[in-house]
Amino acid sequence: IHYHAVIYQALKYAMKTDMVPQNVAMKVDRPRKNSFQPTFLDAEQMQKLFEVVKGTRLELPVLVAAFYGLRRGEVLGLKWDAIDFNRGTLTIKRTVTEATIDGTMKIIEQDSAKTKSSLRTLPLVGSFRDYFQKVKEAQELNKKVCGNCYNYEYDGYVFVNELGERMRPNYLTEYFPKYIAKHGMPKMRFHDLRHSCASLLLANGVPLKQIQEWLGHSDFSTTANIYAHLDYRSKISSAQAMEQGMLLPRSDDFGSRWENVTEQGKITEPDLNPGF
């Protein structure tokens, strides 16, 4: 779909500027979008995943993405100035992505989130306060040990290695699914941690509107379209509320003998062949 759209727009511009006589892409049907089904981990599977990545470079990115539902670029875009240890907040305001530009793979940094709603401040719960504190202390120690060998170009970023090199987005995309598959986990993408976060929030009774704000979706329809089908628990609650609020007739012999009602409101003998 993406390639078709790019070619279509390029030829549209070329035709507008008289570079080509017609847009031949108009004669090609737009490819159908594949209905991708994300993988949703339940709480038990999530605990197993945490054990699988424990002690690896994947551990903290996985924990952050699973708990906060962050996108890959939001995880790797975290800097220390976004973490307020005193106030206990985590602000999502940067992204780091990877794309091919002029045939070369390049890192793209943006000091703004994907959309205005993506810019959000979330609570820094106790466990994550400890995680980040330990990482920050380790970085300071690495700077002293490495000296001039330390790469200060990415100083301030949370996810760097012992030499200060920043973790690449494609590292998470490529190595995460391969590594966890070797350890018996279901086939899934790194982005599915975000989906799993939403499904766990739903399972614990968090309304879709609050999930929208937690994930940073630009509008409610985005959240509803992706996750509403998981929200069966709320439908059960609605049905129970209706049962309590509405006195339904007893089901004794229900439907065994229906009487006809005329337009004048009179009741007649039941029609054994109603014709519907």
Regions found by a protein language model. Give the residues of each.
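N-terminal core-binding DNA-recognition domain of tyrosine site-specific recombinases/integrases
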Residues: 1-19, 35, 165-171, 186-192
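Basic, Lys/Arg- and aromatic-enriched nucleic-acid-binding interface segment
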Residues: 1-3, 16-80, 85-86, 117-119, ...
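Proline-centered turn/helix-capping motifs that create local helix->coil transitions or kinks
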Residues: 14-24, 85, 94-101, 134-148, ...
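Catalytic-site neighborhood detector that most strongly recognizes the C-terminal catalytic loop/helix
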Residues: 32, 40, 96-98, 129, ...
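C-terminal catalytic core of Y-nucleophile DNA break-rejoin enzymes
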Residues: 50, 89-91, 100-101, 110-134, ...
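Short, basic (Lys/Arg/His-rich) helix/loop patches that form interaction surfaces
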Residues: 51, 55-58, 68, 122, ...
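Short, polar N-cap/turn motifs at the start of nucleic acid-interacting alpha helices
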Residues: 82-89, 186-187, 206-226, 236
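C-terminal secondary-structure termini that scaffold catalytic or DNA-interacting sites
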Residues: 87, 98-100, 104-119, 126-128, ...
